[in-house]
Curated annotation (Swiss-Prot):
CDD domains in alphabetical order: PoNe_Nuclease
Lineage: Bacteria, Pseudomonadati, Thermodesulfobacteriota, Desulfuromonadia, Desulfuromonadales
Protein name, UniProt field: UPF0102 protein Pcar_2217
Highest taxon of the lineage: Bacteria
Species this protein is from: Syntrophotalea carbinolica (strain DSM 2380 / NBRC 103641 / GraBd1)
Molecular function in Gene Ontology: nucleic acid binding
SUPFAM superfamilies listed in its UniProt record: Restriction endonuclease-like (SSF52980)
Protein family per UniProt: Belongs to the UPF0102 family.
Regions crossing the membrane: none
Pfam name, any one: UPF0102
């Protein structure tokens, strides 16, 4: 991954974390690497544990950011979330899976939040 792309991704995650804090959520972890994949942001709001996938783009020529979270990516996030819950012993909290799309327009950010962007059958 190029430095420029990594830098854009980090910028988007910083924007998303700030947005979540302003919504009253507590950021528990960021960029967690698990044996089964990475989690961008883990936040808590009341009795809910929110796993947030952040997608950042400069424009829409490669599609809208949220479109990059397909079925395979959802499965990877689910496996990583299961690992996180077991490792941290937080299984009493209700999980939710969100996507935050960040589009960079010059120095400005456009944030779109999709709470409960995908559901997990049988959770």
């Amino acid at each position: 991954m190029t430095y420029q792309r990594l830098s854009l991704g980090r910028w988007g995650e910083d924007i998303a974390a700030g947005y979540l804090r302003r919504q009253g959520m507590k950021i528990l972890d960021r960029n967690i690497r698990t044996p089964v994949g990475e989690l961008d942001i883990v936040a808590r709001h009341k009795r809910m544990l929110i796993f947030v996938e952040v997608k950042t783009r400069r424009g829409i020529s490669h599609g809208y950011p949220q479109e990059a979270v397909g079925a395979a990516k959802q499965r990877q996030i689910l496996r990583a979330a299961q690992w996180y819950l077991a490792e941290r012993r937080l299984d009493r909290l209700q999980p939710r899976f969100d996507v935050i799309a960040v589009r960079r327009r010059g120095d400005e950010a456009e944030v779109e939040h999709f709470p409960g962007a995908f559901d997990v059958d049988g959770w």
